[in-house]
Regions:
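Catalytic cores of the polymerase beta-like nucleotidyltransferase superfamily
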Residues: 1-516
């Protein structure tokens, strides 16, 4: 039997049963990939996916093991003899075990992997202690904290590995080895040979790191960003006026890191935010905000994860909106009029090119287009007391799926990350700014918030009571009533109908006569 103590070092205990069942079929079985690497690094807590390699045929053995243990079986690649077995668990992520046929001898198989730290194997036999197999120097590179390619063709054979190098360096806190960097730079343009879906998935993992802005900067340093996210690369060296102290690219890096801090706080990965005042302002709604940002816009892509992407896209329109003028005092002032609309177009087009879902593209576009709205509201209500009518209009205009939609919250948190980025140069008014944002959040979660089904009157009632024919006037009146209801100016059906009548009189509108 496989030692439970061994399993506890690097994986969920249920995997012990899988290994024992496989060893009853044939031996040895090799544990390969990230689980071995993470075990040697002591980063193994909570491993829920395991990669195994064994001699062919794998598919029938995997099916028998799955049937015996009650796991689900999926043939992933019949030609290459690769299968997956999955154990669903209540209140915990599923356990996933991928089983692949060895590509030749074990040494040949390991030599085909991407980086030395991933080319490690643990040989498992029934009557022998586990044995670490390291033919590529992976253990030494783990100790040196380096990401090094296995061989001279590792990157050319699969260009998406260049993105993986950045991801693993950020994930593990390693540096990319000099020789590997020298291989990446002349091959950087080949990264687009990988499918859009594979590029997207690697970029998603990079942006899911604790400091995704640093990952973006590393992609740029290596020459990869211009090929996978050219609009972001184009923001480098685009100057800005105070309160900004960085160019647009440097600012974007900072906003992404602040957005990641908010993401990690909302998802429970951390219990504190860098700014204590910000944390205090958001704390009353943390649970509700967490529920909102847990919503998946597509499989595996939550609103929380998208916060960093919104930060990435929000100022990509600035190069196309750059202008410089001389003010009365003779000082040069840089402006970016309308950059949010350009950013919105870029966000939609790039998200679509990366094969994000239609819903994700829609949300990315509206958030980029709206990211200046909270700043403008703060300027209009400098004391932080944003009116209920303004709150209603903001949430209405940023909704992407009817009145129940709260995409405006995504805009607000992006604005908070954006407002933090200038640091001390942001000037005064931070407390008032937080009060204003908190007021909109409070309005969004208020029990009496205007939503589908709780308006004072509907179109049928309006047309019947005021003798109106269907048309744009009815829509205008309903929206006007909803605004007034949100502002607390009308609280009953009678008051709503009276308001509608007054609006009709002001407009000089004469109702249509039936049959006329």
């Amino acid at each position: 039997m496989i030692s439970e103590q061994l399993i506890e070092r690097w994986a969920a205990p249920e995997f012990a049963g899988v290994l024992d069942a496989l060893l009853a079929e044939r031996e040895p079985v090799y544990v390969v990939g990230g689980a071995v690497r993470d075990a040697l690094l002591g980063r193994n807590a909570g491993v829920t996916d395991l990669d195994l390699a064994l001699a062919s045929p794998v598919l029938p053995a995997a099916r028998r093991v799955a049937d015996r243990l009650g796991w689900a079986y999926y043939p992933l690649d019949e030609e290459r003899d690769v299968a997956r077995i999955v154990l669903a668990r209540e209140d915990a992520p599923p356990l996933v075990c991928d089983l692949a046929a060895l590509r030749g001898e074990l040494a040949d198989d390991l030599a085909l992997r991407d980086f030395t730290v991933n080319a490690l194997a643990l040989e498992i036999r029934r009557d022998h202690p586990p044995r670490l197999i390291d033919i590529c120097g992976g253990a030494e590179d783990l100790h040196a904290r380096l990401i090094r390619v296995v061989g001279p063709q590792s990157l050319a054979s699969d260009p998406v590995r260049m993105l993986r190098a950045v991801r693993f360096a950020g994930q593990l806190g390693f540096a990319i080895e000099d020789g590997t960097e020298r291989q990446i730079q002349p091959l950087a343009n080949q990264v687009t040979q990988a499918s859009a879906e594979r590029q997207r998935d690697e970029l998603w993992k990079i942006l899911a790191l604790p400091r995704p802005g640093d990952g973006l900067a590393e992609l740029h340093r290596l020459g990869l960003l211009a090929h996978v996210l050219p609009e972001a690369a184009a923001t480098d060296h685009i100057r800005q006026s105070p309160p900004h102290h960085l160019d647009v690219f440097g600012h974007t890096v900072q906003v992404m890191n602040y957005a990641a801090a908010l993401r990690d706080w909302l998802t429970g990965q951390t219990n504190s935010l860098p700014d204590a005042d910000l944390q205090a302002a958001l704390l009353p709604w943390r649970e509700k905000l967490a529920a909102h940002f847990a919503e998946e816009l597509s499989a595996g892509h939550s609103r929380a994860g998208w916060l960093v992407w919104h930060a990435l896209f929000h100022d990509t329109g600035k190069p196309g909106a750059f202008s410089e003028e001389i003010e009365d005092a003779g000082e040069r002032r840089i402006r970016f009029f309308g950059h949010e609309e350009i950013s919105a177009t870029i966000a939609a087009e790039r998200s679509d090119a990366l094969r994000f879902s239609r819903r994700e593209v829609q949300v990315a576009q509206i958030v980029a287009a709206s990211h200046m709205r909270p700043h403008h509201l703060s300027e209009s209500f400098p004391d932080g007391a944003i009116s209920r009518r303004a709150c209603y209009r903001f949430l209405r205009d940023t909704a992407t799926g009817g009145r129940e939609d709260r995409t405006g919250l995504d805009v607000l948190l992006l604005a908070l990350a954006d407002r933090q980025a200038p640091g001390k140069a942001r000037g005064g008014g931070w407390g008032e700014y937080l009060s204003g944002i908190a007021g909109i959040i409070d309005f969004a979660f208020a029990p009496n918030r205007i939503a589908a089904g709780n308006t004072l009157v509907d179109g049928t009632t309006l047309m019947r009571s005021l003798d109106l024919a269907p048309g744009r006037m009815v829509g205008f009146l309903l929206e006007s009533i909803a605004e007034a209801q949100a502002a607390g100016e009308v609280t009953s059906e009678d008051e709503a109908l009276a308001l509608a009548g007054e609006l009709i009189r002001r407009a000089g509108f004469l109702p249509a006569v039936d049959g006329g």
